[in-house]
Each structure stands twice: as structure tokens, then as C-alpha cells.
Amino acid sequence: MAYEFDLEDFNDNLEPFGFNCPAKDHFIEKLEGLCKTFRKSGEDIVDDVVSVMSNLGQKSVDSGILAKLEENLEAQAQKTVHTPRSVKKPARGRVPLAEKSGFILSGDPDDIEKPSHHLTNSAIAKLEGHFLDFSPFPGSPANEKFLKRADPSHVVTTIRGKKYQDKGLKGSTKSDDTIRIISKTPSTLYGGDKSSMVIEAKAQRMADIAHRIQKSFEEIVDWGNPSIPSVDVVYTYGQVIHDETKDNEKFGEHSVALMINDEDGTMIRMDFSKMTEDITLFPGQIIAVRGTNETGEELQVDKIFQPAALPVNPVETDTTKEIWFACGPYTATDNCGYEHLCELLDKVVAEKPDILMLAGPFVDKKNTFLNKPTFNITYDNLLEDLLLKVKETLVGTKTQVIIQPNASRDLCVPPVFPSAPFQQNRKLDKIKKELIFVADPCIFRISGVEVAMTSSEPIQALSNTEFHRSANQENIDRVARLSSHLLTQQCMYPLEPTEVPASMGDLLDVCCIGSTPHIVFAPTKLAPSAKCVNGSVFINSSTLAKGPTGNYAKMSINLNAGELMPGETVADYAQIQILKI
């Protein structure tokens, strides 16, 4: 998204001024809303925030700061609207084409307007030591900020289950250590979705969820037609969509419609003025509603029925597992040294976890170094050499490594979600036994523990789109609520339309959840967190390379500590840590 807000980056920019923004959900939600409304990024509004905080003499962002910020941004927007068209910015001097360096010619279009102040090669720090040995592109400059970072290995957050014990964690286990992929794999081809098959799959999914809702709520005896004018109460179900007559309005309470599960895909507008309970809606959500349609124009909804999460499968009680997770990018956006990944692998060699999960992007399209004229290898060769380095570094360990691409940012896969695993050519074929290549999303099982992973940022996408109304809104855990949608909707990406280009046929087939996973690794740009939700634990480690530092996650599971009792989850017997690299 062009107008994103990232709390960690925002605080990094505020830190030099001695200011900070607390990681409170309603603050984050407000700042995200301001960025989207005024078409700015988090970095764009830093100066405005600093100005407001300096004027008010405050060190920490609060509701008053945000209110004043919104007032200032609104004033700026009005000023822009009323600026006469005849007032033009003075033209900047242009550099004649013959005088432009190769660096400028190969850069962004904006670079031709800027004088070149880049450092000479002799002033650029070079990779050294094991960072040089590890880098798949030895000609990359070093990341000096990473080498000088503060608080390496600092624990950002910890969750310790009430029955977790360190004792016996490294002991032998009788359970099967084989990783079994239980989710479907998308096609390596794309663009061949048949409309009739997609419609049939959507209709079947709506019917399945409606059946689960009906089983959970005895008052729903039968489904009716909500488009027929009547004073009688009707129960119906369907998919939440943005009212097509209000496309110019932001998705919300007054721009919601329901697409009915009939042959015509009938759309009925919904009015929630009679609703007294909490409302949570997003496009693509499948719900049931109760209401009346006296005029035939819109359904006056007085109750919403949400499906419950699927049950969690049992696990083997003698299981001990150390699972690590990291999400790309794995190097800074202006180099190709992969120092962050090298450092992580050094820790893996030292501590030897059972599983290391690495989610993309590996070759990031946002990496500006890949556009430099000095970068003279193909993206595929860069990926191949990087994964070979990963394999070589972990020789002698028993750590199983899982590799997952990111369709929206990895340059070595088609930009279509769900994403098939990286294609293995001759180089990668040599290491297919050492590295496990999986799709995005993927669910696998080991010793009965079901683990889901995705790099597509569904929770971030829901955060950008979801409408929620509650009398107790400030005291509700927003991230937990967003995470719960994946479980109740039985889908690893329940938002429709998606924020990433998608194959609807594969999405409906591959993203389905047959049971609630015990663990879900779903990184986002939101603040790092670990949340227990509906019998599962959602872990957001953020990214491994983020400015001068980054984060990764460790999870230790010890079911030798006792037998899993009814109502308990794997999280009760686990310790989760999110650490800085």
C-alpha cells in the first residue's frame, strides 16, 4: 500500500527528537486512518507530529496530540485545494543528458532532478569476514548501521504458558519428527481460472459456513429471501461486500451490502441503525443476519451471526520442539549483503532449533540496490546462491529449514497469490533434501502440532479495511480480533477483494482451513506481538531486516510437562519470545 503506517519505523523517526508513540491499538488505528485519509506515509507525518509535540511540550503521543495532528493535516489539505493553478513551483535546473552519470541514468526518474551526492567507492564500507563469505553478492556494500546497532538479542516480548517447563526440553522425543504438508499447493500456472468453477466454489463455501452458523444458533430454523418486501423477520446469509453505489465512500457502516448465495448473486443493502451489539465487518466476510425489509430497498439488520472457529486437533503429549521463525526482507533495502540473515543463521548453528521457518521476500522488489548498474547478476542466480549459502551454513545441524516465497514482493515468483513454492532448478535440486520448499500460505503438521505460516500479511490487510463499532472499543484487543477472522472464516486470507493480486480459484481452494492450527505465524507491519486466539497462538515477529535491526521469533514447546487437558492449548505448554537480531 502506498500510504502505510508502521509503528516501529514511526518511533525510530521520533527517537532523535526524544519523542515516542505508545503501542496502543487505538493510537495505531487512528494514525493508520490519518495516513490513508490524507494520502501520506508514516514517515510523511513525522515532521507534523514533532511540530505538534514540541508546541505542546509533550514527549509521548496521546489523544490530544492526534486530534491536533488531524486538525493541522486538514488545514494543509484545504490550503492545497484552494491554491490557484497559476501558482507554479519554480523550475529546477536540469542536468544535460550528456553530463548525466551512468548511476543517474540507471536510477529512478526523480534522480535526474537531483544533484549526485553519493559516496565514492573508496568511502563505501565493504563486506568483511564471515559476512563477506556468506553474501551471495560479494560486491555489495556493508550495512554499517546494522554493525553498529543497539540492543542485539534484546527480547521485545515474551509469553510463557502456565504449564511450560524448561526441564526436559532438549531431551529425546518419541514422536515423529517428519514435517507433513497438509494444505494444498497452488498451481504453478495462473490466469486459467474458470468463472463457473470459481462461482461454484464460492457458493459452496458460503453454504458450508451458513450450515455451521445454523448449527450454532437454534433460533435460525430456515433461510429466507431478504429482497422481498415484508414486515416479517427474515434470516439470511451471504458475503459482505462494499455497496457498489457508494464506491467513493470508505468501507464502513453506511456502505455495506450482502451478496446473497443465489444464482444471480443478488445484492441487498444493509442498515445497522437498529443494532445495539458490536459490529465487525470486512469485504469478503461470510455472515448471517436477522432483520426486516419493509420497503424492499434495504434490510434493517438487528442481529449479526458469526461462525465459530473450528476445533483444534489433539497433539502427542511427549512432544518437545524448538521452532524459530523469521520473515524477509533479509537484508537492508540499499545493499545485498544479507548480514541480518547471516547473523540469524549463526544463532541457529549455536542453539540448534528443530525447525527454522523463513518466509519471503528473499529477493525484495523494494530493494533499491538491485537497480544499481553494479548489480550484474540475475535475480534467480541471487536467490539460488543465497539458498546454497543457507544450506552450507547449517551443515552439521539437524535443523529442518522451511522456505516460503512472498508473491507480492519476491522477484523470483509470479506476483500472484496464493504462491507456489520456489521452482527448483539444477542448483536448488541439489539441496531439496536439506531445504523444504512450501507454498504461501502453508499448513504443516509435526508430532501432531499443526503450524500455519503466511507472508501475505492478511492481518495487515484486514487492519486496513475492517470496520468495527463497539461501545467498549478502546478496551478491545484489536490485533486478536483481526487474527480471529482467519479462524472463524476458515481461510488464511478471508479478505475479498485481496490487497495482493490473486487467483480466486486457488485462493478458495488453497487458503481453506480444515481445523484451527495450534500456531499461526503471520507477520505484519503492526507492532510485534504474540496473541492467544480461539485455541491458537498468532505470532507476528515483523521483519528480520528493518532499518538498522529487525526481529525474529522463537517458540519452545514442551508437552513432556504434562498431558494436554480439555480447554488447554499448545500455548499453555510453550514459551514464545520475539527478539531483535
Curated annotation (Swiss-Prot):
A single GO molecular function term of this UniProt record: DNA binding
Give one GO biological process term.
Answer: DNA replication initiation
Chief subcellular location equals nucleus
Task: Tell me the domain of life.
Answer: Eukaryota
Which Pfam families did the record assign? Answer: DNA_pol_E_B, DPOA2_OB, Pol_alpha_B_N
User: GO terms for CC?
Assistant: alpha DNA polymerase:primase complex
Where is it located? Nucleus
Q: What is the protein's quaternary organization?
A: DNA polymerase alpha:primase is a four subunit enzyme complex, which is assembled throughout the cell cycle, and consists of the two DNA polymerase subunits A and B, and the DNA primase large and small subunits. Subunit B binds to subunit A.
Similarity comment: family membership: Belongs to the DNA polymerase alpha subunit B family.
Q: Which protein, by its recorded name, is this?
A: DNA polymerase alpha subunit B
Organism per entry = Caenorhabditis elegans
